[in-house]
Regions:
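Short, acidic/polar
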Residues: 45-59, 113-128, 175
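A short acidic, helix-capping loop that chelates divalent metal ions and anchors anionic groups
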Residues: 37-42, 102-108, 223-227, 277-280
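Beta/alpha (TIM)-barrel catalytic core signal, keyed to glycine-rich beta->alpha loops juxtaposed to Asp/Glu
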Residues: 12, 17, 142-301
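Acidic (Asp/Glu)-rich catalytic clusters
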Residues: 21, 83-91, 127-130, 181-182, ...
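Conserved beta-strand positions
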Residues: 31, 69, 97, 136-139, ...
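CE4/NodB-like, metal-dependent polysaccharide N-deacetylase domain
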Residues: 117-138, 158-161
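Short, well-ordered coil/turn segments that N-cap beta-strands
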Residues: 25-29, 63-65, 90-93, 131-135, ...
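N-terminal binding-site loop/beta-alpha segment at the start of enzyme catalytic domains
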Residues: 2-93
Length: 301
C-alpha cells in the first residue's frame, strides 16, 4: 500500500479549489478540451461546432471554471471554439493553454521550443482566445534541440511583458522543474498520471509540497475507465468497479475521485464530447471515498 496522506477525502470536493499561482482559485475538476477538434489526430475544426460550444457552456454551468487547451489542438481551432463559446470569460473562468509543440498535419507533430517560436505561439493564442493576458501558459514539451533554460526564459519574458500571468510546464521531470524554478515561478505541472499509471508519484508529491498545481493528463487512461468503455479484465478495473458498486458510481468516476483524493494540488481535466459523460465526470467530484475504499484502491498490482 502506498503511504500517502488521504485525509482530503473527507472534504466536499465540489467545494474544493486550488489557487494556481496563489491568486487563481479554480474548482479541482476542470475540462480538457482537446477532443473538440477534427478527428483523427485532433486536426482541423470540430465538425459539430455549435454542439461543442453548448458542451463548453454546459461545463461552466455545472461549475467548471478551468479549461485546458493548447496551440496544436486543431491546430488553433480548439482555442477558437473555446473563445466562441466562453469569451469574455465571466464568472472566474480560467483558460490554460500551451505552446512549444507544432502540428502541420494529422501525423506531423514536433516540439518547437525556440524562444521566437514560443513568442509567436503565445501571440497567436492570445488572438484566438480573445485575451489580453493568458492566465496560465504552459511549455507543452521540452524541445531536445533547444536548451531547456532558453525555452523557459522565453516564458519568463512573456510573463514580464504581461502577456501571460503564470507559467506552467508539461511533460517534465523533477530536475527540469527545479531548473525552471531558478528562472521563473512554476505554477503548474501537467504530466501523464492516472489510476493505472503512477510513475509520476515523486512529481505529484513535489508539487504538493511546493504549492504547484498538478494537472494529470490522461486521467482516465483512455481505457478502460472512460465513460461507456467496457471494463477490462484486470485488477485495476475490478477494484474500481468493486468500489463503484459500493458507493453507486462508475469505475471512471471512482478513478477521478481517486485522483482528487491523491493530492490537494491535483486538478483533474477529463475530456469528452458527450454531455452525459461530462455530467458523469463532474459528479465524480462529490464522491466520498472512505479510508477502506482508498486502502483497497491503493494496493498496487
Amino acid at each position: 500500500m502506498l503511504d500517502f496522506n488521504w485525509g482530503i477525502h473527507l472534504i466536499d470536493l465540489m467545494k474544493s479549489t486550488f489557487n494556481i499561482g496563489g491568486d487563481l482559485p479554480v474548482f479541482r475538476l476542470g475540462y480538457g478540451a482537446m477532443r473538440l477538434c477534427g478527428q483523427p489526430g485532433n486536426f482541423g475544426p470540430y465538425p459539430e461546432w455549435e454542439a461543442g460550444k453548448r458542451l463548453l457552456l454546459k461545463a461552466v454551468e455545472l461549475g467548471v471554471n478551468f479549461i485546458d487547451t493548447a496551440h496544436p489542438y486543431g491546430p488553433g481551432y480548439n482555442e477558437e471554439i473555446i473563445a466562441d463559446a466562453l469569451a469574455p470569460y465571466t464568472g472566474g473562468v480560467v483558460v490554460a493553454t500551451k505552446g512549444g509543440v507544432e502540428k502541420t498535419a494529422q501525423d506531423r507533430v514536433f516540439a518547437d521550443g525556440k524562444p521566437e517560436s514560443l513568442r509567436r505561439f503565445c501571440d497567436a493564442s492570445l488572438k484566438r482566445l480573445r485575451l489580453q493576458q493568458i492566465d496560465l501558459y504552459q511549455l507543452h514539451k521540452p524541445d531536445p534541440e533547444v536548451p531547456f533554460a532558453e525555452s523557459v526564459g522565453a516564458l519568463s519574458q512573456l510573463r514580464d511583458a504581461g502577456k501571460i500571468r503564470h507559467v506552467g510546464l508539461s511533460n517534465v521531470g523533477l530536475e527540469q522543474i527545479r531548473e525552471a524554478e531558478g528562472i521563473v515561478p512554476v505554477c503548474s505541472v501537467q504530466n501523464r498520471y492516472n489510476f493505472e499509471e503512477r510513475g509520476d508519484d515523486p512529481v505529484v508529491d513535489y508539487c504538493e509540497a511546493n504549492g504547484i498545481a498538478y494537472l494529470p493528463w490522461g486521467p482516465l487512461a483512455a481505457k478502460p475507465f472512460a465513460p461507456g468503455a467496457p471494463l477490462a479484465d484486470n485488477s485495476d478495473a475490478s477494484r474500481l468497479a468493486a468500489v463503484g458498486r459500493r458507493i453507486g458510481a462508475t469505475a471512471g468516476q471512482v478513478a477521478l475521485a481517486w485522483l482528487l483524493a491523491r493530492s490537494p494540488s491535483i486538478i483533474v481535466i477529463p475530456g469528452t464530447t458527450c454531455p452525459k459523460h461530462l455530467e458523469e465526470n463532474i459528479k465524480a467530484a462529490s464522491l466520498k471515498l472512505s479510508s477502506e475504499d482508498l486502502a483497497e484502491l491503493n494496493v498496487v498490482g
